[in-house]
Amino acid sequence: MWIRECRKEMGFMNGLIYFFLPGCPFCRQAQEYWAELEREEPKYAGIQAVKINEREQADLADRFDYWLVPCFFLNGRKLHEGAADKAQIRAVLDQALSELL
């Protein structure tokens, strides 16, 4: 029920959503891995994500069930939460590719 209500309010719910905090070293590292993967494998460059700064958009972030950043949701379900290595970011991007493109 909650996801359905959010989908009505937030049309972007069906996609990749990335929650982050400025200054978070784990978020910065995740973004660096993402950029590296885009350079290494151009297929990742086509992935669009809604990026939500949880400090500036706290009202929106509070609607999602997570505690740690970086955090990735895909089509309403959590894919990854917390510090991530390059392989974990690749797994998020691969899942997004398989479901979105």
Where do the PLM segments sit?
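Local sequence-structure signature of Cys/Sec-based thiol-disulfide redox active-site neighborhoods
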Residues: C6, M10-E40
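CheY-like receiver
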Residues: L60-R63, V92
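Alpha-helix termini
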Residues: E38-Y44, L97-L100
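Thiol-based oxidoreductase modules, predominantly thioredoxin-like and allied folds used
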Residues: Y44-A58
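Structural micro-motif
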Residues: R63-F73
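Non-catalytic, surface beta->alpha helical segment in thiol-disulfide oxidoreductase systems
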Residues: F73-L101
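Generic recognition of short, well-ordered alpha-helical segments
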Residues: R28-E32, R63-F64, A84
